[in-house]
Amino acid sequence: MAACSVELGVITAGGKVTEQLPFTTAMNISQCRHFAASGLTPLGAAMELALDRLEERTAAYRKAGVAYYQPWLVVISDGVPTDQWQAVSARARSLAQQRKMVVMPVGVEEADLEALSAFSTRPAKRLDGLKFREFFLWLSASMSRVSASASTTEQVRLPPTDSWDSI
């Protein structure tokens, strides 16, 4: 059921901001590309694009009269934002406070967790080593629970994160 409900978009910020994958239904994704960290981290510009895309998507659903679940914006970074990110972090946090989206910040290796946390109403979590597989399994299980919930506004109990996060 989640594969029919979940859409995925990927935007990278390795040196420059690139929309790697426009919103695509999960069941239509047959393989995953590998992304390598490189260059500067224009996280502010990447988040601006991500927020714009999410707002465009939810507006299209509203216009078509389609019910949708609160979108999740997963932000994964391995460093420190290298552009002007403070204004867009306030925008993301405001949208999260208004319950228009969930922002899930995740730090890898030497990521600046304080900067990542500024984008969300919840603190950033640090990925334990390189447990990306465990993280994406957790994310998939979480999305399955959300899409199986009875209502688009219902609070959903998510699985524990101990398989992938470090304390």
Predicted regions mapped to residue ranges:
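Arginine/glycine-rich "motif VI" loop of SF2 helicases in the C-terminal RecA-like domain
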Residues: 1, 93-101
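Von Willebrand factor
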Residues: 1-21, 30-69, 73-76, 83, 102-115, 131-138
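A generic structural signal for alpha->beta connector loops
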Residues: 5, 98-100, 121
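Conserved beta-strand scaffold positions in the cores of enzyme catalytic domains, especially
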Residues: 10, 103-105, 124-126
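Short, flexible, mixed-charge acidic loops at enzyme active sites
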Residues: 21-28
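Von Willebrand factor A/integrin I-like adhesion domains
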Residues: 31, 109-167
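Mixed-charge (Asp/Glu-Lys/Arg
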Residues: 85-94
